[in-house]
Amino acid sequence: EAEFTRFVRQIADQAQPLLAELCDNRGLTVTMGSIACAPAADWLAQLGAGGLHGFYSLGQDKRGALVSTSVGELVAQFERILGGTGEVDEDCHTLPSSAACFARQFEAKVASLLQRASDRREFAVSATGEHAHEIMPFAGNDKVWTVVLTATPKGATSGWSIRFALCQATLNDLVGARAVSPATGRSIGARGLDGSAIGHVELPLRAVLVDVPMAISRIA
């Protein structure tokens, strides 16, 4: 759970600027909901109808992230961009052709979001659809880690829920491949010590005297 929490926090941090740009709303905020672990079948039941789902693979068919959002909420964001109030019919379960381009832009932002949060460029959308069970490669009894992020544009009365689900194998892959950047030595350069960034930093200095008996004949 700790590893997934860390990953989700990175997603939330990266989501704000990306979604703010997508929605043309600098005041947009992103909040992270509670984290849960449940069988994939239970998660699918919670998604309900009228969703837009995308599976973002991690270079392998069964490893990746399932990202879901409501068609109605997606259309509401698009309507706000056009200057509307963001109010849509409750039975808006099918993506209108006018919002198809916006949906593709959303998918591109999610792919970028996953890449940045995981530092894995392999993340890419491999399947999309209105029915999650048709594109999700997890078995119904597979455990998945889930979280809901809520994006709320400035001035909006309601938020936009974006749901993430990852299987344990995907999480293990992300954790196992996490690269630890080695320390990189940098030379001071032609400016010398006084002209370097540490030239005027006071550093503690300690000298240790060591008694080393040595014959005078050995000293040149």
What would you call each of these model-derived segments?
Residues 1-220:
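N-terminal auxiliary interaction/assembly segments of multi-subunit proteins
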